[in-house]
Amino acid sequence: GLLGNALLSTKLDSVLKSIILWSSEISIMLLFFLVICFVTLMSIMGIHQIVVIPLILTLLISPDVNIGLFVSAFMCIFTWMLSASLSPLNVLNVIISRCVKTNGVRVAYHWNGKYFLSITILAFFYVFVLDILD
């Protein structure tokens, strides 16, 4: 997106690039974990995934990072879905919390958290398999 591309020549881009390069040399699982943490943290702070994911994807598909295109794509798609669902600022979580008259944080973390913990474990396994096959 436009906002993600605007961040490409900033200090954030260089810091993220060094973290992504460092973690990709250690383990694909560490890289996936850091991508999930970063995008989810940005989402919780109110920065939409459409700003963060293009920046991450651009860094993941660079020649310096030795991971496949399918692995990069899955990481970004899964992280977008996870961070959007866990963010209490997400419109869907706000609507649900108002309908059931419950705090948005409770809806995001307590109700969705158990489901997404199990899905995230499966996603780590899937990334591992994709990386081996690539």
Describe every region a protein language model picked out.
Residues 11-26:
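Membrane-interface interhelical connector segments
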Residues 48-78, 131-132:
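Hydrophobic transmembrane alpha-helices that form the pore/transport pathway of multi-pass ion
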Residues 36-40, 55, 59, 74-81, ...:
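Transmembrane helix-bundle signature of multi-pass membrane transporters/permeases
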Residues 1-12:
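Core transmembrane alpha-helical segments of multi-pass membrane transporters/permeases
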Residues 80-134:
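Juxtamembrane and boundary regions of transmembrane helices in multi-pass small-molecule transporters
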Residues 22, 58-65, 94-104:
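Helix-loop-helix connectors at the membrane interface of multi-pass transporters/channels
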Residues 28-38, 66-85:
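Alpha-helical transmembrane segments of multi-pass membrane proteins
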Residues 24-63:
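Hydrophobic alpha-helical transmembrane segments of multi-pass integral membrane proteins
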